[in-house]
């Protein structure tokens, strides 16, 4: 029996699904530009949202300059940011990652 490898992207091909990339951020000016650029390159049809959680640096400015939609969440804490993202954004597929470019 021959095995067939199916990638998730193959399952969604030609389905015109809306994809939202959600990036909760706090003081990520050093990395957020690269993170947004990398997601734009990998998922060119996705909408990229950066949720800034009271950053004191240029996180929001840099993310916006790279083409992300920036929203502010004034209630401090990642849990508040995540709840706000899923309340605000309507999409068929959600991709959430941190804005600090870490991969686990």
State where each predicted segment sits.
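Structured catalytic core of nucleotide-sugar glycosyltransferases
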Residues: 2-104
